[in-house]
From Swiss-Prot:
A cellular component annotation (GO) from this entry: cytosol
Pfam families: MoaE
Family: To Synechocystis PCC 6803 slr0903.
SUPFAM superfamilies: Molybdopterin synthase subunit MoaE
Protein's name according to its UniProt entry: Uncharacterized protein MJ0717
Taxonomy of the source species: Archaea, Methanobacteriati, Methanobacteriota, Methanomada group, Methanococci
Gene3D superfamilies, sorted: Molybdopterin biosynthesis MoaE subunit
GO biological process terms, semicolon-separated: Mo-molybdopterin cofactor biosynthetic process
Length: 119
């Protein structure tokens, strides 16, 4: 499930914890923020922020479905901010509910790597 409002993501996290109680062994999470610099050719270059188009949300829905099909996980929640993001702003939050940490971490790594293709 994908969200473009962080508060909705947090609310759904709480709901899923109750819904899946006893079924999951871990929730593997990731939170990404805009850095004050970018790396270009190994050099630190000051950042002015980043712009994220709303069409990324549709692409990320597909990534989530792919991850659910590829890895043995219970559920995936994904928040992604859009518009112009300033330094320090949250870009994305991901929560993978899994029976075991191995599958949870593998699914999370896959999602992050796919997400980075669109940034």
């Amino acid at each position: 499930m994908i969200f473009n409002e962080y508060e909705e993501f947090c609310k759904k996290m709480d709901e899923c914890i109750e819904k899946y109680k006893g079924k999951f062994g871990c929730i593997v999470t990731f939170n990404g923020f805009v850095r004050e610099y970018d790396l270009k050719d190994g050099e630190k270059v000051p950042s002015k922020g980043m712009k994220i188009d709303e069409d990324i949300l549709e692409k990320l829905k597909l990534v989530i479905e792919e991850a659910k099909n590829k890895f043995d996980v219970i559920d995936i929640l994904f928040y992604h901010n859009t518009g112009f993001l300033s330094i320090g702003e949250r870009i994305a939050s991901i929560a993978v509910f899994a029976r075991h940490r191995k599958e949870g971490f593998e699914a999370l790594e896959y999602i992050i790597n796919e997400m980075k293709k669109y940034h």
